[in-house]
Curated annotation (Swiss-Prot):
Zinc finger region(s), C4-type: 761-787
Native organism: Agrobacterium fabrum (strain C58 / ATCC 33970) (Agrobacterium tumefaciens (strain C58))
Gene3D superfamilies: ABC transporter ATPase domain-like (1.10.8.280), ABC transporter ATPase like domain (1.20.1580.10), ATP-grasp fold, A domain (3.30.1490.20), P-loop containing nucleotide triphosphate hydrolases (3.40.50.300)
Alphabetical list of Pfam families matching this protein: UvrA_DNA-bind, UvrA_inter
One GO biological process term: SOS response
Name this protein carries in UniProt: UvrABC system protein A
InterPro entries linked: ABC_transporter-like_ATP-bd (IPR003439), ABC_transporter-like_CS (IPR017871), ATP_grasp_subdomain_1 (IPR013815), P-loop_NTPase (IPR027417), UvrA (IPR004602), UvrA_DNA-bd (IPR041552), UvrA_inter (IPR041102)
The ABC transporter domain, residue ranges: 331-609, 629-958
Predominant place of localization: cytoplasm
Protein family according to the UniProt entry: Belongs to the ABC transporter superfamily. UvrA family.
One Gene Ontology molecular-function label: ATP binding
HAMAP family: UvrA
Subunit structure and binding partners: Forms a heterotetramer with UvrB during the search for lesions.
Residues holding ATP: 34-41, 662-669
Encoding gene, per UniProt annotation: uvrA
C-alpha cells in the first residue's frame, strides 16, 4: 500500500467548527492561525490530536488503558492518515516542589548515573579522596568504644528494597544464622512474618552479639569478615543500649532513615571510608544522588532544598509603625487585650511603650519580642472581670509560631501561620537537596549539586571539556552517558533556554518556558512518524531566539514527523510549509477555513485577514506622536537585586504606556512583578506580598491602586464563569428576581443561583451533567436527565424574560447577551466590556476551566475596564498578547491606550514588536538571559532604543520601524 500523503479530515464540527473538510500534508510544518476564538484549537487539539491519541490508546489492552487518560471521540465524520499524536500545550509543567528542569528533561537521571560510575568520593573532614577500610581498621574502631559497650554486629543484606525474601531467609537458616532484624524488629529466622512484596524492607542478619573487651580482636575480625561477605562489603555495629528518640526513626516520620535504624549505629564499608573521621559512604549507586529517594535525600529538608521558617520581616512588615498600631502583623488583627498586655509587660522589662515605633526599640527588646527571653518576666493579665498574674519566660513570637505550625492538625491554622513563613535554603545541605555522602562524591572538583546550579550554557561547556579531565578507564565508562547529557543540553540551548539552571524548580517556569522544555525532551526522544501538536511555542520568547525555535520545529519535521503549530507569530507563519487560516471572526462567526496553502497563497487570498496583515495591507500603526513622561511623576526602584538583577535602579514613568522588554530570562518579571508590583501591592493595597530584595522604591504617592492582570485561571471549578467573575451574574439574577412572575412566586435572587439549594436542579446539584466513572474508558459525563443540562429546576425555568429563562441566558454568547440586555445597563455594561476585549464569542456561563490563559487574562481585563476609573491606577500586564491574532492585538492596544488616556499608567512585559513599537516609553532589560542579564540596557522612546547598539530589542525594532509607515493608531474594524 502506498504511504498516505495527507491527513484527511471530513465534517469536523467540534465546538464552533462548521463541518470543516480539510486535507493537510503529512511530514510538513503546518501553522494554524486566525482570530482568537475562531476555532484553531478546536481543530488542532480537540479534533486532530484527540482522535490521534484516542486511536492509539484504544489499540492498547484494557489493563493498560486504565492508566491512560482516554480522550472523548471528537465530533467529526472521518479522519484518515493520522499517526499517534503528542500534544505540547501551554500548561505549566508541575507544581511539585520536587520537580526540577533537570528531572523533567531526564538530564539529572544521566548525571546520577555518571556520578555513580565515575565520581570519586572525598572526605569532608580532610578533603582527601576516601579509601576503602580494611577489617583491621574496623576492629580498631570498635575496640576504641568504651569497655563494656553491648553491640550487635549486623550484616545489612537488604536495604530499602521491595520483595518477600523467603528464599534468602531460608538460605540464611541453612548457613546456621539464627536471628535477623527486619524493619526495626529482631526475630528468630523461623518466626519472621510474611513480608509484603509491595513495600520496601530492611533486613540485617545478626552475625554476633558482643561486649567490648580488649581481648576480643580475633572474634570481631571473624564476625566482621562474615558480615562483609554477606552484605557485599558492608557491616554495622549497633549499640544495644542507645535507642534513638522516636522522632529520629523511620517509624517516627523521619523519611530518610532505614527502618532498622532504631538505635545508634556505626556503618563500616570495605569500599569507601575516611580513615581520619570515619566518614563512610555506603555504596555509590545512582539512587544516592536522588533527592526523591530516602537513600540520597538530605534528612533535614527531605530533599526539598529549603525549609519553611518563620520570617522576621513578615512578622514586622512595616517597622515604622508603633506597637499599638499593629507593627507586629500576627497580633495586629486580634481584638483580644492579651497581646497588648503581653507587650506592656515586656515593655516594663525592656524599657519601651506601646506608642514606640518598632525601629525605636533597642536590639535587645526586638530580640526578646521575636525570639523570647531567658529570664522570667512578670505578666499581668486582665480579661473582663478576671485578672491574674504570672511569672514566666516569654516564648517569643517566632518560636511560638513555629511550634504551633508543627503541632497543629488544623489546615486553617497551618495556612494562617504560613503567611508569616518563607522558604529559606536548608542549612544542612545548603539548598543542594542531598545527603553529605552524596555531596562528597566529585568529578573534576565539583559535586553533582554544584553542576546542577550552573546555567545550561555553562553546564554545556563543562560537559564538553570533561573528558579531558578523566582518566582512560573513566572515559570508557562515561562516553555513552556524556553523549546523552550533551545532546539534551544542546536541545535546551536550541529552544532558547540556555539561561535556566538544571536545579530550577519547574513550578517557577512560565507557560512558554515549560512548553519549550517539553519540546526539548521530545526532540531528545528522537521519535519519528509522530504527529506533534503545539500551542504557541513562541510565547515568552524574544525575537532574537525565534529563529532557533523555528529551526527546532523544522528539525522535528525533517526526521519524519508532522508538526502542527497553533501560532500567531509572523516569522512562524512565514516559515511554515502549509498555513491554515480559520475565521472569518470569532465564536459562532468563525469555524470555517478561510484560506489554506503556502504563506504566499494565504497572502494572495483577499478574504484572509491574516494574509492582509502579513502582506502589510493592514497593520498596527506607529503613533504619530508619543506621550511625553511628566518630569517627577514616576515610580523609581533603587537597588533591585532579586534573582539575577544586578543592583538595578530604574524609573517607570506614570501616565504613559510603558513596555518592559528584553530577552527571556533577562530579569523583566523579577523587576516588574517580583519587585515593583509586590512592593506596590503591599504599600498601596495592604497586600501580604513579599517583594524581591531591593533598597527602596519612591513614587507610590502618585497611585491609589495597582493591579496585576496575569494569565492564571479565573477559577478552578466548572462553577466559576465569566458572568460570575465580572460580576454580571448578580444583576442578571436581580433582574430575573424582579420579574412579575418571580415576584408572584416570592423568588429572591438566590433562587437563580446554581450553587445553592432552592432554584438549582438537585439531581446534578446545579452542574448540568452527572459524572459516571468508567474504569477502562474515560469518565463519562452524561447530561442530567432531570434538568437536561439546564442546571435549574423546572419551577425556576418557568420565569422568563423575552421568552428566555436564566439557563438560556447563560448559554448565550457574550455578543448575544449585549443585545439581549440592551435595556438593562447594569448587565449590558459588564458584558460590553467582555465584548470590547474580543471575547464576544465565549458563552456568558462558560466554565472557567475551559478558558485558555489568554482568555482568562482578557476576562480579568474586562472586569477592570468595567470599574469606574480613578485615573490613578497602575495596571501591570505580563504578555497580554498571548493567544492574540494581529487583529486582536490592534483591539487590545486601543483599550490599553484608552486606559492611559484616562490618566492611568499601563506597564506591559512584552516580546511582541507590534505592541512595543506603539509604547510611549521602553525599559529594556538584559542584555542576555540568566547571569548574563539583570541590567538595564536602555530606556527611552522606541526611537531612542533603536540607537542603542547593545539592545537586541532595538535591533529588531529598527527593522520594523523602517518597514512600516507612521500614522494614527489604526482602529480595528
Amino acid at each position: 500500500m502506498s504511504e498516505l500523503k495527507t491527513i484527511s479530515i471530513r465534517g469536523a464540527r467540534e465546538h464552533n467548527l462548521k463541518g470543516i473538510d480539510l486535507d493537510l500534508p503529512r511530514n510538513k510544518l503546518i501553522v494554524m492561525t486566525g482570530l482568537s476564538g475562531s476555532g484553531k484549537s478546536s481543530l488542532a487539539f480537540d479534533t486532530i490530536y484527540a482522535e490521534g491519541q484516542r486511536r492509539y490508546v484504544e489499540s492498547l489492552s484494557a489493563y493498560a488503558r486504565q492508566f491512560l487518560e482516554m480522550m472523548q471521540k471528537p465530533d467529526v465524520d472521518q479522519i484518515d492518515g493520522l499517526s499517534p499524536a503528542i500534544s505540547i500545550e501551554q500548561k505549566t509543567t508541575s507544581r511539585n516542589p520536587r520537580s526540577t528542569v533537570g528531572t523533567v528533561t531526564e538530564i539529572y537521571d544521566y548525571m546520577r548515573l555518571l556520578f555513580a560510575r565515575v565520581g570519586v568520593p572525598y572526605s569532608p573532614a580532610t578533603g582527601l579522596p576516601i579509601e576503602s577500610q580494611t577489617v583491621s581498621q574496623m576492629v580498631d574502631r570498635i575496640l576504641a568504644f568504651e569497655e563494656g559497650t553491648r553491640l550487635y554486629i549486623l550484616a545489612p543484606i537488604v536495604r530499602g528494597r521491595k520483595g518477600e525474601y523467603k528464599k534468602e531467609l531460608a538460605e540464611l537458616m541453612k548457613k546456621g544464622f539464627q536471628r535477623v532484624k527486619v524493619d526495626g524488629q529482631f526475630y528468630e529466622i523461623a518466626d519472621v512474618p510474611a513480608l509484603d512484596k509491595k513495600y520496601k524492607h530492611d533486613i540485617d542478619v545478626v552475625v554476633d552479639r558482643a561486649v567490648v573487651r580488649p581481648d576480643m580482636a580475633a572474634r570481631l575480625a571473624d564476625s566482621l569478615e562474615t558480615c562483609l561477605k554477606l552484605a557485599d562489603g558492608l557491616a554495622i555495629a549497633e549499640f544495644a543500649d542507645k535507642p534513638l528518640p522516636p522522632e529520629d526513626t523511620a517509624a517516627g516520620g523521619s523519611a530518610n532513615k532505614s527502618l532498622n535504624e532504631t538505635h545508634e549505629r556505626v556503618l563500616f564499608s570495605e569500599k569507601f571510608a575516611c580513615p581520619v573521621s570515619g566518614f563512610t559512604i555506603p555504596e555509590i549507586e545512582p539512587r544516592l544522588f536522588s533527592f526523591n529517594n530516602p537513600f540520597g535525600a538530605c534528612p533535614s529538608c527531605d530533599g526539598l532544598g529549603s525549609q519553611q521558617k518563620v520570617d522576621e520581616n513578615l512578622i514586622v512588615p512595616e517597622p515604622a509603625r508603633t506597637l499599638r498600631d499593629g507593627a507586629i502583623a500576627p497580633w495586629a488583627k486580634s481584638s483580644s487585650p492579651y497581646y497588648n498586655q503581653t507587650l506592656e509587660a515586656l515593655g516594663k522589662a525592656f524599657g519601651f511603650k506601646l506608642s514606640s515605633k518598632w525601629t525605636d526599640l533597642s536590639k535587645e527588646a526586638q530580640h526578646a519580642i521575636l525570639q523570647g527571653t531567658d529570664d522570667k518576666i512578670e505578666f499581668n493579665y486582665q480579661d473582663g472581670a478576671r485578672s491574674y498574674k504570672t511569672v514566666k519566660n516569654f516564648e517569643g513570637i517566632v518560636p511560638n509560631l513555629e511550634r504551633r505550625w508543627k503541632e497543629t492538625d488544623s489546615a486553617w491554622a497551618r495556612e494562617e501561620i504560613e503567611r508569616y513563613m518563607s522558604a529559606a535554603p536548608c542549612p544542612a545541605c545548603a539548598g543542594y537537596r542531598l545527603k553529605p555522602e552524596a555531596l562528597a562524591v566529585k568529578i573534576n572538583k565539583l559535586h553533582i549539586g554544584e553542576v546542577t546550579q550552573m546555567s545550561i550554557r555553562k553546564a554545556r561547556d563543562w560537559f564538553e571539556v570533561l573528558p579531558e579531565n578523566l582518566n582512560a578507564k573513566q572515559n570508557e565508562i562515561a562516553v555513552r552517558i556524556l553523549k546523552e547529557i550533551r545532546e539534551r543540553l544542546r536541545f535546551l540551548n536550541d529552544v532558547g533556554l540556555d539561561y535556566l539552571s538544571l536545579s530550577r524548580n519547574s513550578g517557577t517556569l512560565s507557560g512558554g518556558e515549560s512548553q519549550r522544555i517539553r519540546l526539548a525532551s521530545q526532540i531528545g526522544s528522537g521519535l519519528t512518524g509522530v504527529l506533534y501538536v503545539l500551542d504557541e511555542p513562541s510565547i515568552g520568547l524574544h525575537q532574537r531566539d525565534n529563529a532557533r525555535l523555528l529551526e527546532t520545529l523544522k528539525h522535528l519535521r525533517d526526521i519524519g514527523n508532522t508538526v502542527i503549530v497553533v501560532e500567531h507569530d509572523e516569522d512562524a507563519i512565514l516559515t511554515a510549509d502549509y498555513v491554515v487560516d480559520i475565521g472569518p471572526a470569532a465564536g459562532i462567526h468563525g469555524g470555517q477555513v478561510i484560506a489554506e496553502g503556502t504563506p504566499q497563497d494565504v497572502m494572495a487570498n483577499p478574504k484572509s485577514l491574516t494574509g492582509k496583515y502579513l502582506s502589510g495591507e493592514l497593520g498596527v500603526a506607529v503613533p504619530a506622536e508619543r506621550r511625553k513622561p511628566k518630569k517627577g511623576r514616576e515610580i523609581k526602584v533603587f537597588g533591585a537585586r532579586g534573582n539575577n538583577l544586578q543592583n538595578v535602579t530604574a524609573a517607570v514613568p506614570l501616565g504613559v504606556f510603558t513596555a518592559v522588554t528584553g530577552v527571556s530570562g533577562g530579569g523583566k518579571s523579577t523587576f516588574l512583578i517580583e519587585t515593583l508590583y509586590k512592593s506596590a501591592a503591599r504599600r498601596v493595597m495592604g497586600a501580604r506580598e513579599i517583594p524581591a530584595e531591593h533598597d527602596r522604591i519612591d513614587g507610590f504617592e502618585f497611585i491609589d491602586k495597582v493591579i496585576d492582570i496575569d494569565q492564571s485561571p479565573i477559577g478552578r471549578t466548572p462553577r466559576s464563569n465569566p458572568a460570575t467573575y465580572t460580576g454580571a451574574f448578580t444583576p442578571i439574577r436581580d433582574w430575573f428576581a424582579g420579574l412579575p412572575e418571580a415576584k408572584a412566586r416570592g423568588y429572591a435572587p438566590g433562587r437563580f443561583s446554581f450553587n445553592v439549594k432552592g432554584g438549582r436542579c438537585e439531581a446534578c446539584q446545579g452542574d448540568g451533567v452527572i459524572k459516571i466513572e468508567m474504569h477502562f474508558l474515560p469518565d463519562v459525563y452524561v447530561t442530567c436527565d432531570v434538568c437536561h443540562g439546564k442546571r435549574y429546576n423546572r419551577e425556576t425555568l418557568d420565569v422568563t424574560f423575552k421568552g428566555k429563562s436564566i439557563a438560556d441566558v447563560l448559554d448565550m454568547t457574550v455578543e448575544e447577551g449585549v443585545e439581549f440586555f440592551a435595556a438593562v445597563p447594569a448587565v449590558r455594561d459588564k458584558l460590553q466590556s467582555l465584548f470590547d476585549v474580543g471575547l464576544g464569542y465565549i458563552k456568558v456561563g462558560q466554565q472557567a476551566n475551559t478558558l485558555s490563559g489568554g482568555e482568562a487574562q482578557r476576562v480579568k481585563l474586562a472586569k477592570e475596564l468595567s470599574k469606574r476609573s480613578t485615573g490613578r491606577t497602575l495596571y501591570i500586564l505580563d504578555e497580554p498578547t498571548t493567544g492574540l491574532h494581529f487583529h486582536d492585538v490592534n483591539k487590545l492596544l486601543e483599550m490599553l491606550h484608552a486606559l492611559v488616556e484616562q490618566g492611568n499608567s499601563v506597564v506591559v512585559i512584552e516580546h511582541n514588536l507590534e505592541v512595543i513599537k506603539t509604547a510611549d516609553w521602553i525599559i529594556d532589560i538584559g542584555p542576555e538571559g540568566g547571569t548574563g542579564g539583570g541590567e538595564v540596557v536602555a530606556t527611552g522612546t522606541p526611537e531612542d532604543i533603536v540607537k542603542v547598539e547593545r539592545s537586541y530589542t532595538g535591533h529588531f525594532l529598527k527593522e520594523l520601524l523602517d518597514r512600516r509607515p507612521a500614522g494614527k493608531r489604526e482602529a480595528a474594524e
